[in-house]
Amino acid sequence: ALAALLSDLSERGMLEDTLVVATGEFGRTPFVLKQNPPGRQHWPKCFSSILAGGGIAGGNLYGKTNRKGEYPTRNRVRPEELAATVYHALDIPINDPQDASGLSRLLTTGKPILDLFG
């Protein structure tokens, strides 16, 4: 379904004006736990995200884990950096946005990952 959505947006010339984000707040244990029944649990040390459109350069991977997928080894991304990247793609000011009542609010303390943009 995600591939079809991205294809449709691209074919209609809408992908550059649309940011698609698919993410989760945690991964799964990179090993099968010895429990009954055996299985995997939440693993907060690594998670995956897909960002497409909205100025994001396509066909790239960002970040790397160790061989077992347990821990980030390069370009670790924290949730606040992911949020800042989304706000940047949508041209939403991070440090001084105003809500509908005119109040200024700090949306995130993270910095956008500019290497993701083409």
For the regions a language model picked out, list residue spans one by one.
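Ligand-binding pockets and gating/stacking loops
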Residues: 1-118
